[in-house]
Amino acid sequence: MPKSGRDGGASKDSKYDLSKISARVDRVNVSGLLRTHNDYVMRAADGLFKASNFQDLMLEAMSTKSYLHELGIFKDVSVHIDVSRGADASPQGYEVTFKGNEMSRMMGSAGTEIGQNEGSLRTELTIPNILGRGENISLQGSYSSTRANDLQLKFWKPFFHTRFKENRPEMSFSIFRQTDRFDISSFQTTNIGYLVDFSAHTMVGVDLTHSLQYENAIRDVGLLNKSVPFAIRDHCGPKLASLLRYSVVYDNRDGNVFPTRGIYLKSVNEYCGLGGNVAYTSSTAHGELNVPLFAGLVAQFCARVGVVKETKNTTQLPISSLFYCGGPLTLRGFKFGGAGPVVESTPIGAQSFWCTGAHLWAPLPFAGVFKNLASHFRMHFFYNIGNNNSFSTENMRSAFGMGLAVKLAERARIELNYCVPVRHQDTDRILNGFQFGIGYEFV
């Protein structure tokens, strides 16, 4: 029997350097393709044929498995690696087989969805892989009792199987009906139209996510009550908006909700006036910097800025495209839209705004005892500063406080803060005390 221990030839703790075991892939099989065309998965094996040792083979096999999942055609994928057999087998050859289980011809789902300071009920009916190369058709509907309701029919086409697969190009066409309520200003907008979207990644120096959209929609502004100022009534009625929208995102954070390090940058630019009777340009930018300190403490600095301007074809800036500053996602200590210009005590939105936030995040005191539970909670101290229709520090608003945040599945968070407004204007709607917020992008 072999000995165990330092002098033995075999040990339960023996380790092998897989990078020193020569290996090459002779053949790759993908089984389970029922409705999918073969050329859609052909490029999945590109990395496997470059493997020169067993460690590379294992890593590339896992990468290929992830790639097959991203194609959007399989429920699950399993990997089998076996020695290569047959007359054409090489001495260190292996055969890799991926067994996939294709998605059903029709799928449905229902659940909740987190938006910016709102939650909604969402249902979706999807026909996946309809043409055999990852194309999807989906009918989506969402309902919220607070702000927005949506109905959307969407056709989505990925191009992951092309030679540009590393760029993850995607294209979609949507027909939508969207209703947004602005209770603070007593109006709502109903948009009916279509949207064409093309998105891709670029990795020249840094990894950026780009999205280029064309939207054509009828925007109808309606009133929620009779006692609305004329400045808002003047915007009522349907108008046709035709616009281009470009957005770019850079994100190297180590987490979406409670990051400990990294930078997040996002920019959205719109040009409206390609047709119809609505014309303007709009730009918004959001930035976030996270710096680890000690004992689990993290310093976070956030900023957001937005500007909407007239063009030579502008007759009136649409009220739904103006900025509403204030609320738990921008300026804590103020009600939603409560830090901005007003007409007859009614907020009407601003053509520009800026706000910043400094945070000190800390784990809960008992984080070491209840590790799994405590990882979903954080305490923070914050100080927010902002203003609208002016980029100076005169007449700016500010507030500080502390609160508790809860993570929701790495996608959003809930905050319960105690806020103390420091600087505000007489017409502002302040909130001195507890404030509740839910969303995925905070300042």
From Swiss-Prot:
What family does this belong to?
Answer: Belongs to the SAM50/omp85 family.
Signal peptide, first to last residue: none
Instruction: Specify the POTRA domain's residue ranges.
Output: 23-101
Q: Where in the cell is it found?
A: Mitochondrion outer membrane
| Keywords recorded for this protein, A-Z | Membrane, Mitochondrion, Mitochondrion outer membrane, Transmembrane, Transmembrane beta strand
Cellular component GO terms, alphabetical: mitochondrial outer membrane; SAM complex
Q: What name has this protein been given in UniProt?
A: SAM50-like protein CG7639
Q: Which domain of life is it from?
A: Eukaryota
Output the lineage of the source organism.
Answer: Eukaryota, Metazoa, Ecdysozoa, Arthropoda, Hexapoda
